[in-house]
Amino acid sequence: HRLTSKQLIAIFTGKVKNWRQVGGKNLPITLINRTQGSGTRVTFEEYGLNGRESAVAQEQDSSGTVRQIVSSTPGAISYVSFGYVNKAVQPITINGIKPTERNVMDNDWKIWSYEHIYTNGQPTGLTKKFLHYLQNDHIQKTLFNKLGYISVKDMRYQRTWQGKISKGSGVE
């Protein structure tokens, strides 16, 4: 389960239609996309496909459904967030880099994003308390990790909403 970024792009843009074309078995490729506008799809197309759109293919509303279809369909390929990866599906190594938490934190694995929270001016009152609650170590290390997310405090790089990368955690 190794691909180059060029092969990944060729598969998801519909130029490669059989796994044999990228060194695999003689098996048709079945693309499964998340729906248009899904944050997972937007992230994948921006950072996995370098801004290209996926070919027209079956679309699913949830990552759980995507995982189930990929796990039960020979030749299927898709994308989900870490929280949905389990033994039923095999993550793909791209350009020799595995999609691990460490590789995301170090920005070696490029297909990642995190949510940004914005307020109208400096937060006050309940808004300020809620933001502090989300950033406390207990929530970052337990709840977020339990849900399959990497704590923003563990990130060694941050990405702005415009896609610019800089060294440092995403906590401001």
Model-derived regions: residue spans:
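Exported/periplasmic ABC-transporter solute-binding proteins
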Residues: 1-172
